């Protein structure tokens, strides 16, 4: 599928299966989300640009590769996106963090924005937007639009699960933003949930209903 990368690493697939199980506890779900987010982050940052730097090892001076340019920005779509942040920040502790408060109205399924806070110089940074679920795509579309309004030009979207409907909507709205996901499920049900899915990621992560 054009513009969509499915990360099919065996560890990702295994952990995702356990997360799908309805009997997986809140603590277990949260731990697995942290673990899988680290693996997903590894893949979404695979092609970051490098530059050479002169360093001194205990034995000699050498030219060695380091990341080029300004630090990354991880943009979390609240609240469930925060579940992906912890593992990603363990891998890239120097990353800046943006928070985009968007929730889906359960009656209209439309996105409602309520909060936005982001680092400066978004135009000079790679921004990786994170949300466990790409369902209708409305929240993600709105979040990316807000980031673009604030200057972001180089954006990637990372999620755990995606529905074909959400992918279609997102790609139509933001064809310049590639999607990275651990799996593409069958469809959305009448309530806008991904099927077979894993339920509401935020509720399962925080033990709420």
Curated annotation (Swiss-Prot):
Keyword Lipid biosynthesis part of the UniProt annotation: no
EC number: 2.4.2.9
Cofactor: Mg(2+)
Pfam (any one): UPRTase
CDD domains: PRTases_typeI
Cofactor binding note of this UniProt entry: Binds 1 Mg(2+) ion per subunit. The magnesium is bound as Mg-PRPP.
Keywords noted in UniProt: Allosteric enzyme, Glycosyltransferase, GTP-binding, Magnesium, Nucleotide-binding, Transferase
Family according to the record: Belongs to the UPRTase family.
Biological role stated in the UniProt entry: Catalyzes the conversion of uracil and 5-phospho-alpha-D-ribose 1-diphosphate (PRPP) to UMP and diphosphate.
Protein name: Uracil phosphoribosyltransferase
Protein source organism: Agrobacterium fabrum (strain C58 / ATCC 33970)
